[in-house]
Amino acid sequence: SKGAIPPHLPESNEQNLIVIEAFLEAAKRYARGGYDVIVDGIVGPWFLEPWLNIVQEHYEVHYIVLRASKEETMKRAIERSKLDRETNIELVETMWKQFSNLGIYELNVIDTTTHSIKDTVSAVKEKIASGTALLYCELDGRKSHNVVV
């Protein structure tokens, strides 16, 4: 039996992939049932391969990254921390670096620095409606089920 490994540790990669696969399978089932699905989690481009694979299965997958300025991100994270302050700051700084320049996925980012929750929801809906955050598969661009990551 395996025990939980804190997700930020390097040795948690296999566990993190299992979590992504579990999200993915649940999302697919809901989507096949006719539901639009939003997966809310930390999904960096390094975890997109499984999502790109389901595009080949005709799922419509939008990849949207909510990102505030570094200062605002640090403020929000410290306010809701479950870890000690020093560990939390270190983790958030690491994640900030990982998400600060997403290369080809920069167009998928919504800057939430000054957004209220309502503003953020509106921006996400707009991004979905516009199709600007869709993931595409080189082999097949057809889509039929809607999943937002």
Regions found by a protein language model. Give the residues of each.
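Conserved substrate/cofactor phosphate-moiety recognition/catalytic segment
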Residues: 1-22
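Short catalytic-loop micro-motif centered on adjacent basic/acidic residues
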Residues: 37-40, 109-111
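Conserved phosphate-donor/acceptor-positioning beta-strand/loop module used by diverse small-molecule
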Residues: 57-77, 110
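Short strand-turn motif at the edge of the Rossmann-like AdoMet-binding core
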Residues: 41-42, 68
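Conserved ATPase "switch" residues in P-loop NTPase domains
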Residues: 27, 31-32
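Loop/turn-to-beta-strand initiation segments
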Residues: 33-39, 62
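Small-molecule kinase domains that catalyze NTP-dependent phosphoryl transfer to phosphate-bearing small molecules
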Residues: 79-123, 132-149
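Short, electropositive alpha-helical surface patch
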Residues: 46-63, 125
